[in-house]
Amino acid sequence: MLRKVFAVVSVLLVVSAAKVTKLVLDDNYVNRVVGGEVAKNGSAPYQVSLQVPGWGHNCGGSLLNDRWVLTAAHCLVGHAPGDLMVLVGTNSLKEGGELLKVDKLLYHSRYNLPRFHNDIGLVRLEQPVRFSELVQSVEYSEKAVPANATVRLTGWGHTSANGPSPTLLQSLNVVTLSNEDCNKKGGDPGYTDVGHLCTLTKTGEGACNGDSGGPLVYEGKLVGVVNFGVPCALGYPDGFARVSYYHDWVRTTMANNSK
């Protein structure tokens, strides 16, 4: 089944009511949190929402420092910096927080080569963010997270396939798989490799539309970026960019674009 589902994945460009081009992916690719609970206020102060003005929440992301947000490449392709803003400092999409302007979008030069690989990108804020109790950076991990580890997924993705999007940030603990188990349970080894991290708990728990680009955290460090899944929470693994694998790319890309 998974092999067939992945085969029909396609990228769609949709124009919002505000005539702003927004990149979305069909339901076989973008993700959200299913089976989670409302996150406590301030429990994920590194979590941001990438927003399209006039449209709203598009993807998640993680604040790495006062200027940079880590997200998925597919959240950035087709956009110019002026197309996006970054919401920080709130668990609610309806109130609180601060919307920040973006001045640079960067993603891996081999994004989607091969398909579903190198899905990682960076967003540079126009001005440094002001840190507070509700706005904090997260350290990105240099070490690979082990299999069978309990990790934390957060996001504003749909709470069921074709279901509603939550106003409040959702949180869910999930369990990592080895790449071997991920390929076995996913049904097609061509879509995951050493640059991926997979999670799976049970049917009814996982990522969904709107979670893309968001954080997966282990022992307080960022270990994954939401990439893809079978919508939604149907008992198949969810795929993430493995942050430890892309650690050097993240570090050098930020350093080379600091001015």
UniProtKB/Swiss-Prot annotation:
Transmembrane annotation, as ranges: none
Alphabetical list of CDD domains matching this protein: Tryp_SPc
Places the protein is found: Secreted
UniProt enzyme class: hydrolase
Catalytic activity: Preferential cleavage: Tyr-|-Xaa, Trp-|-Xaa, Phe-|-Xaa, Leu-|-Xaa
EC numbers for this chain: 3.4.21.1
Position of the signal peptide: 1-17
Active site residues of this protein: H74 (charge relay system), D119 (charge relay system), S212 (charge relay system)
Gene Ontology cellular-component annotations: extracellular space
Domain Peptidase S1: 33-255
Key words of the record: Digestion, Disulfide bond, Hydrolase, Protease, Secreted, Serine protease, Signal, Zymogen
Propeptide, chain numbering: 18-32
GO BP annotations listed: digestion; innate immune response; proteolysis
Keyword Methyltransferase: no
Site (Required for specificity): G206
Cysteine pairings via disulfide bonds: C59-C75, C182-C198, C208-C232
Tissues in which the protein is found: After blood feeding, expression is induced in the midgut epithelium, followed by secretion into the midgut lumen.
PANTHER family (alphabetical): FI18310P1-RELATED, POLYSERASE-RELATED
Name of the protein this chain belongs to: Chymotrypsin-1
Annotated organism of origin: Anopheles gambiae (African malaria mosquito)
